[in-house]
Amino acid sequence: MEKITISTEFIKLDSFLKYVSAVASGGEAKIRIAEGEVKVNGEVCTMRGKKIHPGDIVELDGNQFEAVGK
């Protein structure tokens, strides 16, 4: 699992996926989230505006990313 430092209180799920280079664009993030391919803390999440806080774990294509604070 890769730890990803975020410098704000939260980051939206679609922006997080772009930030960690799990997707190539915001459009791809929107589609992948809408199709139920993304998990947040082990549960499928279809809300691209979902707030990701430090401690949350995002999973896509078998890759896991943990958001951590500064």
Feature locations, PLM:
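Secondary-structure boundary/capping motif
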Residues: 1, 40-44, 67
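A basic, amphipathic helix-loop patch mediating RNA/tRNA/ribosome contacts
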Residues: 9, 13-54
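A detector for short, charged/polar N-terminal pre-domain segments
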Residues: 1-11
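A positively charged, amphipathic N-terminal helix/segment that binds anionic biomolecules
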Residues: 3, 57-70
